[in-house]
Amino acid sequence: MYKGKPQLLLPIMGWALSITAFYPGFMSPDSLNQYSQALNKSFNDHHPVVMAVLWSEFNKLVSGPFPMLIFQVTMYWLAIGIIYLKKIEKNNSIILILLSFSPFILSILGVIWKDVHFAAGLLLLVASSLDRKKFKIRFLNIIVLTLEVLLILYIANVRGNSWLVILLITYLWINSYLKSVTTLKKICASLIFTIGLFGVGQYFTYQVVKAKQTSIVNDYLVDNLIYFSILEGESLIPEIEYDDMVACLPATIAEMKLNLRFFCLNISGKYNTSSLNTDQLLDESKQMIVKHPWAFIKYKLAAFSEFQGTFWHKNYYYWQTGGVDSNTLGIEQTDNFFTISLKKYSDTFATLLPFVFSPLFWLWSSLVAVTLSWRRRNIDTENVSLILAASAFLYNFQNILGAGGPDFRYFYWSAIATTFSMILLKLNMPHSLAHEIKTSSAPWKFFWIVLTIVFIFQVQIFHHVNYLDLIQK
């Protein structure tokens, strides 16, 4: 079947090029923190414990980031190979291979981040679930099932705050095994299984590994309470002076002017927001949300709109500059020909087509994919495209709860899931996208028109919260 298909070598080439370009594995301060935990075997939950524990096991073979680099790059390119083999007989299936080399996917594929593990692992699980066919040898089916369970258990706990995305992909996975079961039963099974995944993860983290519990949620609660403090005209956090809150308002941190005020307080040296009492912060936040519900909604929408930005603005963080940040752990990285080439490749696209690194572009693109997939849900019986697109939207939209700057990793899965949702749609679509829109019913045409206008003109109607105006009031 595959004779005369030299393109089958492309995923292998992509794997080798990725390993070479990112060798020994790019590392930011977050990566270095996790590696330090893996070395010392002293874990805390500020970063996913399961990832640090896996790293500590890899260190028994080869110390450093290289084993983790191989792990995450292999998950991605193995997923590409599996999907391509399953869709090789489709017209234009080569599109799948070509788009797998997209700069917005490759640019951070070799950075040792939980976000990359999450995205590569999810894509591999989707690939395994797609068009599932059982092996003739029963033992092989058992091995595949076992590996899939371990994989989904890992990715569910490597980014546990994305539980809605996990729930959707879990449904896709369960559906691939239980196609004859009613939808309601599969939804219930997915929900129970997802809860079980997180339950096992919590038990492993705090009972088996005995990881130290941190208060990362404090950062977002402090941001909320700074906003409410400005509304009230006094500090709602007794440990933080009101004047210090006001002093941090004009600062632009990671291109954000609304979120990340806590970071300004921390770098001042006077405060450590993670040491504040979480329960007290939470109680005060709840009271203020009840008192100022509309103001809180407006603030969150404004901050989310600021995070989304515009699709013509060049993203500030789509490449880990320097490869490996300076450290005392003895890890160094030197650019080679492939590193330099990949950076130039990413830089060129980020300059000429900046929208491919924009959260706004992937938010709206995922909505386009959802609408197209929904129209074809009776044809695509597995609903793979629809589930991928929905997960892409939810992954991006969850940043409304609180996010850093528009760092590409924070919507990496959204970019990957949307891309492969559209690829699968194209492979299964007998007509062009223009034909799909043309033959849509009136409500769908209206939706397309509104979506296009909003996308082109970037009408951000909620982006009007200004801290300085609030102070003047």
Model regions and ranges:
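Transmembrane signal-anchor helices characteristic of membrane glycosylation enzymes that use polyprenol
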Residues: 3-26, 101, 193-206, 451-463
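Membrane-interface alpha helices of multi-pass inner-membrane proteins
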Residues: 16, 143-159, 170, 191-198
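Aromatic- and kink-enriched transmembrane "portal" helix at the membrane-lumen/periplasm boundary
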Residues: 20, 49-52, 56, 61-65, ...
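Extracytoplasmic catalytic/substrate-binding loops of multi-pass membrane glycan-assembly enzymes
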Residues: 21-35, 42-54, 58, 62-66, ...
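Specific aromatic-rich, kink-prone transmembrane helix
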Residues: 39, 82, 118-136, 147-152, ...
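Membrane-interface anchor segments at the N-terminal boundary of transmembrane helices
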Residues: 62-67, 302-393
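Transmembrane-helix motifs of polytopic, lipid-linked glycan transferases
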Residues: 70-90, 120, 124
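Membrane-proximal stem/loop segments at transmembrane-domain junctions that anchor or position
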Residues: 211-334
